[in-house]
Amino acid sequence: MTDLAMTVVVAAPQKIMPSLSALAAYLDEVGTTIVSRDKCPVPTTLQHRRSCELWRISATKGELSRSRLAAIGNELKIDINLQSSEQRLRDYRLAVFDMDSTLIECEVIDLLAERAGVGERVATITERAMRGEIDFDQSFKERLGLLKGLSSDVLDELLNNLPFVEGGSELMLSLRSLGIKTVIVSGGFDVFASHVASVLGMDGYLANTLAIADGRLTGEAVMPIVNANTKREQLLTLAHELGVTAEQSIAVGDGANDLAMLGAAGLGVAFHAKPVVRAQADYQVSHTGLDSLLYFLGHRGELAQ
């Protein structure tokens, strides 16, 4: 039996919400009563390309399937998530984010590889690592080794042209106004994490050190590597330092090395994630921007504009 007080959060990447008859039909199929259907406010800066609805439901006779809801959403190219009242009303105090392909629309190590002339080789390894097909630490060392000798001059060029994910600035502004601490914990590089955290107004970052000597990348990994276990442990450490429980944390990521972190958080969100991550995460955002996380914080009042 499904929780008697739940919310279906629907977010679309356009101003006009498409027909949700397929969603209504599925809810009816499992004996769900739709108590209310309301529009959810979206950030002013995104009003021309975002819409959100909250369907409050109760008295579900059958078991609601998150994967079925996600599949309906994928057909409509929108995001549909099921949230319990307890999670919706929880006092979140910490939000931890992956960086590459989560806060920025690229994998930095792949961009560096392109400049080094080994783009295809590194991109293939990156994709396999993010799908969880190969060990992250070994793949990181292998990819980094291929960058040996690359001039550090390319760093400023890349830093000045990083493509930020839509909704990121709106999300951070609102989280900051709510007093939620925001931190990057990335398997990428510190020089980029520092820049991204600064641009978005985040509270801190942890990432791998990019070793440089005589103006060139050394190709050597600086230990310890920020991997899946590091991400999980850092989330737990940050929560402890804030004096809150892990359940009061939000975690967001896209790759297999984010799964442990997502599982440790009270609200783990697979963001435009690889299939292995979507299959294991309770929440997934695949069609809209980072602002969609705000629609899971329903008790917090108006969004910061």
Residue ranges and their predicted role:
Residues M1-F97:
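Non-catalytic pre-domain segments flanking phosphatase-related domains
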Residues Y92-V108, D254-N257, L262:
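Asp-based phosphoryl-transfer active-site loop
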Residues M99-D100, R131, D214:
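Residue-level recognition of short loop/turn positions
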Residues T102-L103, I134, L217:
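Hydrophobic "anchor" residues
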Residues V108-S174:
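A metal-dependent, Asp-based hydrolase signature
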